[in-house]
C-alpha cells in the first residue's frame, strides 16, 4: 500500500487566528489560553509522554476496552464507510479498531485529522499499511470545523456512511453546553446525505469524580512540560507575526517560561478538572504586543477543562445534542466507556 496522502482542508490559516485567540483570551476575565496553542508538535510529544504514565487512567482504560471490544465496535460500522478521527495524535488506541475492521474485511476509508501537518505525517507513517488490504488511510490537515465541512462537501465523502471518532475524552474538553452544541454540529454536517441513517459517532466519556484519582492523573510526569511548551509555541507565533521581535532573546519574548507554574484543580461544583497557568511569585506584565495586560500573582490563566459525566449528565448531554445512545462499551473496573451515538 502506498504512503497515505495528507489533504489540506483548512478553510483559513489558523496559526494567525491562534495569535488573535491568545490576545483576546488574555484581555478578558477570567483569562484563558486557547486549546490550539497546546497541541503543536512538541506539545503533543509531551502530552503523549504524560498520557502513557501509569497514573493517567483514562488512556489505559480506553486501551483496555478497545482491546476487548474492538470487534464489536467494528461490527457497528457499515461497509464502505468514511471514518474520520477527530484528534488522531496517537494510534495506540484507534489501531485496535482499525485492525478489527481489517479482520472483518470491511472496505473503510480512515482519515486522521490534526491541526499539525507534521504530526499528521508522523502519525500516518507509523501505520503498518502493509498489514491492511481493506482499510485505506489518509490525513486531513485542519480543525474540527474544517473536518466537518469536508465531510459534508467533499465528493469522496458526502454520500457514504460516516463514523466520527471522538476518542481521548475529547468531548470532555468542552463545557457542557458547548459539548452538546458540538455533537449537534456533527449531526448537522456528518449525518446528512443519502446515508444519514447509517452515520454515527463513537466517543469516549469519563465518569470518575474521585478527586484524588483525577488529580493524580492530571499531575503525573510530562504534564508540566506540556503546559509550558504552549508558551514557547506562542512566542514563536508572535515572532512570526511581528518580525521586529528578536526570537532568540528571552527579554523580547512575550512569555518568560520561568515566570509560570502549572496548576491542577478539581472543581466539585462543576464536576471537572481544571488546568491553568499561574504566575510563580509576582505579578507579570506581559510584553508587546500584549503590553498593557497584567496577570496578577494569584490569577489563574485557564487553558483546559476535563468534564466528567455521571449517568444523569450523559442523558442530559445526549438529549441536548439531539442524539441517542445505541450501544455502550466498557469493562470491569473502568470509569471510561465508549458510546455509539445516532440522531434521535
From Swiss-Prot:
Q: From the UniProt record, list the reaction(s) this protein catalyses.
A: 4-(3-methylbut-2-enyl)-L-tryptophan + S-adenosyl-L-methionine = 4-(3-methylbut-2-enyl)-L-abrine + S-adenosyl-L-homocysteine + H(+)
Answer whether the UniProt record assigns the keyword Transferase to this protein.
yes
UniProt xrefs under NCBIfam families: methyl_EasF
GO biological process per UniProt: indole alkaloid biosynthetic process; methylation
The Enzyme Commission number assigned here is 2.1.1.261
Protein name, UniProt field: 4-dimethylallyltryptophan N-methyltransferase easF
Q: What induces it?
A: Strongly expressed in planta but not expressed in axenic culture.
Recorded source organism is Epichloe festucae var. lolii
Purpose: 4-dimethylallyltryptophan N-methyltransferase; part of the gene cluster that mediates the biosynthesis of fungal ergot alkaloid ergovaline, the predominant ergopeptine product in E.festucae var. lolii. DmaW catalyzes the first step of ergot alkaloid biosynthesis by condensing dimethylallyl diphosphate (DMAP) and tryptophan to form 4-dimethylallyl-L-tryptophan. The second step is catalyzed by the methyltransferase easF that methylates 4-dimethylallyl-L-tryptophan in the presence of S-adenosyl-L-methionine, resulting in the formation of 4-dimethylallyl-L-abrine.
Q: In which pathway does it act?
A: Alkaloid biosynthesis; ergot alkaloid biosynthesis
What is any Pfam family matched here? Methyltransf_33
Q: Which UniProt keywords apply?
A: Alkaloid metabolism, Methyltransferase, S-adenosyl-L-methionine, Transferase
- Family as reported in the entry's similarity comment: Belongs to the methyltransferase superfamily.
Amino acid at each position: 500500500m502506498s504512503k497515505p496522502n495528507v489533504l489540506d482542508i483548512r478553510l483559513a490559516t489558523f496559526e494567525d487566528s491562534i495569535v488573535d485567540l491568545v490576545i483576546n483570551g488574555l484581555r478578558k476575565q477570567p483569562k484563558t489560553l486557547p486549546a490550539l496553542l497546546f497541541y503543536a508538535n512538541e506539545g503533543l510529544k509531551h502530552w503523549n509522554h504524560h498520557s502513557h504514565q501509569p497514573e493517567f487512567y483514562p488512556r489505559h482504560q480506553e486501551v483496555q476496552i478497545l482491546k476487548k471490544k474492538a470487534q464489536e465496535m467494528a461490527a457497528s460500522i457499515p461497509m464502505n464507510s468514511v471514518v474520520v478521527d477527530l484528534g488522531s495524535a496517537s494510534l495506540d488506541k484507534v489501531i485496535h479498531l482499525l485492525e478489527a475492521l481489517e479482520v472483518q474485511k470491511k472496505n473503510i476509508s480512515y482519515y486522521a485529522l490534526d491541526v499539525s501537518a507534521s504530526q499528521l505525517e508522523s502519525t500516518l507513517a507509523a501505520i503498518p499499511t502493509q498489514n491492511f488490504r481493506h482499510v485505506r488511510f489518509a490525513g486531513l490537515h485542519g480543525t474540527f470545523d474544517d473536518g466537518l465541512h469536508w465531510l459534508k462537501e467533499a465528493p469522496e465523502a458526502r454520500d457514504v456512511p460516516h463514523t466520527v471518532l471522538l476518542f481521548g475524552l475529547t468531548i470532555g474538553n468542552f463545557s457542557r453546553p458547548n459539548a452538546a452544541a458540538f455533537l449537534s454540529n456533527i449531526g448537522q454536517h456528518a449525518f446528512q446525505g443519502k446515508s444519514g441513517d447509517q452515520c454515527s459517532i463513537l466517543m469516549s466519556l469519563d465518569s470518575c469524580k474521585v478527586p484524588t484519582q483525577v488529580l493524580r492523573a492530571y499531575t503525573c510526569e510530562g504534564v508540566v512540560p506540556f503546559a509550558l511548551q504552549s508558551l514557547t509555541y506562542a512566542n514563536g507565533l508572535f515572532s512570526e507575526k511581528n518580525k521586529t521581535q528578536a526570537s532568540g532573546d528571552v527579554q523580547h519574548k512575550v512569555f518568560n517560561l520561568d515566570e509560570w507554574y502549572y496548576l491542577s484543580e478539581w472543581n466539585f461544583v462543576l464536576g471537572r478538572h481544571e488546568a491553568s497557568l499561574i504566575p510563580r511569585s509576582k505579578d507579570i506584565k506581559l510584553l508587546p504586543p500584549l503590553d498593557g495586560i497584567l496577570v496578577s500573582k494569584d490569577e489563574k490563566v485557564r487553558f483546559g477543562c476535563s468534564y466528567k459525566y455521571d449517568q444523569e449528565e450523559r442523558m442530559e448531554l445526549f438529549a441536548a445534542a439531539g442524539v441517542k445512545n445505541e450501544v455502550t462499551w466498557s469493562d470491569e473496573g473502568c470509569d471510561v466507556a465508549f458510546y455509539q451515538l445516532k440522531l434521535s
